[in-house]
A protein has these predicted regions:
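Conserved short alpha-helical segments that host acidic/polar catalytic motifs at enzyme active sites
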Residues: 1-214
Length: 214
């Protein structure tokens, strides 16, 4: 079981990340995002065994912020769901990247092995950005997947949260897999929320059936 979280406020994003650690803390992933077109960089990605230290993340952000002007922060915490993995590997840690797509996924892709390319990926979640690169369409890509699929996706200076099966709580521009103060639970599945004007709002939807009914 994994957890995802994010906010425009780093301290809040980290607090929401910590709320999810009860769901799994084998490894952690972090992304600081910039949405400014004139900036030389678009993101800072950090991956770690265990739990992030907030002060270390702040220092990494400070080192690059004059170049990137980061304005949103997203986390992932992981407990392996499709293996008995005990040794940490950076290549197995979210977010996964292919071309311009970055994805952090909370759940399991039950039809992972039905994709002809599956043998090229050691972690089921890592196939998602690859498929997005082929389709360039989030709703079409996720409609081909089965299982628990809630994720965050960053591409082309746009940020999305996909709700499909796994739990999701949202309050303005903040989200988490775990309930937090003033947050609303997103009950509908098969929806794609886009971060726009400091709010996460529904942008699109896709056909989704929860095979686990949870």
């Amino acid at each position: 079981m994994c957890g995802i979280a994010g906010s425009s406020d780093l301290e809040k994003a980290y607090t929401l990340y910590k709320l999810n650690l009860k769901r799994g803390s084998h490894s952690s992933g972090f992304m600081a995002l910039s949405f400014q077109e004139d900036k030389e960089c678009i993101s800072l990605v950090e991956k770690a065994k265990g739990i992030f230290n907030l002060n270390l993340l702040k220092q990494r952000i400070k080192d690059l912020d004059n170049v990137c002007n980061f304005s949103y922060f997203a986390f992932h915490s992981r407990a392996p769901t499709n293996s008995t993995e005990t040794i940490w590997k950076e290549s197995h840690t979210h977010p996964f990247n292919n071309d311009s797509y970055y994805v952090a996924h909370n759940g399991i892709i039950s039809n992972f092995k039905s994709f002809p390319e599956h043998s090229s990926f050691e972690v089921d979640s890592s196939i998602i950005p690859y498929l997005l690169t082929k389709n360039h369409n989030i709703s079409q890509t996720y409609s081909k997947l089965q299982g628990l699929l809630t994720s965050w996706v960053f591409t082309g200076k746009k940020f999305y949260v996909v709700k499909a099966g796994s739990s999701l709580w949202v309050e303005k521009d903040s989200f988490s897999s775990s309930e937090f103060e003033n947050a609303e639970r997103i009950k509908e599945d098969g929806v794609i929320l886009e971060l726009k004007d400091n709010f996460l709002t529904v942008k699109d939807s896709f056909k989704y059936t929860n095979p686990y009914f949870i």
